[in-house]
Amino acid sequence: MSKSKNAKRFGTRWGFILASVGSAVGMANVWGFPNKMGQNGGGAFLLIYLLFVVLFGCIALPAEFAVGRWAGTGTLGSYARAWRSRSPKAEKAGGALGWLPLAGSMCIAIGYAVIVSYVLKALVDSVTGTLMTVDTASWFQAFSTKDFSVIPYHVIVVVGTLLTLLLGADSIEKTNKVMMPLFFIIFLVLAVRVALLPGAAVGYRFMLTPHWDALKDPKVWISAMGQAFFSLSVTGSGMIAYGAYLSKEEDVVGVARHTALFDTIAALVASLVIIPACFSYGLDVGAGPGLLFVTLPEILQDIPMGRLFAAILYMAMIFAGVSSLQNMFEAVAESLLHRFPKLSRKVVLVLLAVVCLGAGIGMETISKWGPWMDLVSIYIIPIGATLGAVSWFFIMKKDDLLAAVNTGSGKRHGALWYNVGRFVYVPLAALLCGVALIAHVAF
């Protein structure tokens, strides 16, 4: 199979890692991780989460990077070639199955763009000072319960993100080399500021003290596993596209470990900001989206230089949101360019803008956005992720997968790596999918 046009490679190893970290770091790190940590035993949840990050970061993520690089293309082409590895007759079936995880990328992008639009509004209102003088709950309710309330922000987010994809891997790399370092710097600054709040130490103790009884609760294990799995963007789609742009000289397991490490650091630093701040003010750390748009603004209103800290907080969140959207959109764009080679990248990006805004503008209220994200998170994404896991470790020939993983590797990965993937990672992916479908749990 030929490579999709415009599928330029990432120029540097760190450019690839930062782009992958950008995909993985997102809203789930800022409100999802602290929320789940707060509800599932604090330090005990953290220990379980780290265990699964190591597993998925060493097995699942490298597999997706490797398959994309081996196929030389993204989602649709990679599934087709993986299934062809087993039998040429299976190629069409694999290509057809690839549409499901690809649809997951597009559907999650449609909903994700809405919440990033909320963040952009919060950033603008922080800069103007409006957010510092209002009742935060009323402010949030005013636009989150009203149709067509953030259209200008919505258009800016979608069009602005798609413009960063004009040059493919090259422009993705350049933007993430700026956004990701700034994201970490901003959250480190915020963490230092929060450390000075009275009562912050109580939040640190909660975070770092394991409540061992929580280890006996299967729900805690499932929650930590799901958070680790999807926080790393192991969805059977997006990371495959980035893998297609990775040099064959790079070690996919090594870059995957770095991606997992920085994604985990992002989650921990976000928790060091949010959990101690909430404990200091006696506020609920498990407030979901309200945490970002009601709880944190309320805290920022009360501290010196709160307007400045609010502005940099929401700027960091814009970086996290845009870098994640880049991966979702690029996965779809690359596959469409591969499947329909007569299309130009500009035409495809315009098409994505029309679809994203056409579907997303009608769900700008939380009451419509929530069910949409639940639909995607409970059904489409888990099934797509499981299809990917099964395709790599049960359909694709073992020798082909190991050759793909070992390309550029200084250390050979053999039967142990493969068997952990086949008999541990795949069953866990299927378990998460089953829990999502049967118990209607969104990870």
Give each language-model segment a name.
Residues 97-105, 146, 329, 333-353, ...:
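C-terminal membrane-solvent junction of multi-pass transporters and transport-like membrane proteins
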Residues 1-32, 60-65, 69-96, 247-251, ...:
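Membrane-interface "cap" regions at the ends of multi-pass membrane proteins
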Residues 57-76, 81-82, 92-139, 318-337, ...:
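Hydrophobic transmembrane alpha-helices that form the core helical bundles
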Residues 4-7, 36-40, 73-100, 113-170, ...:
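Inter-helical loop and helix-membrane interface segments of multi-pass membrane transporters/permeases
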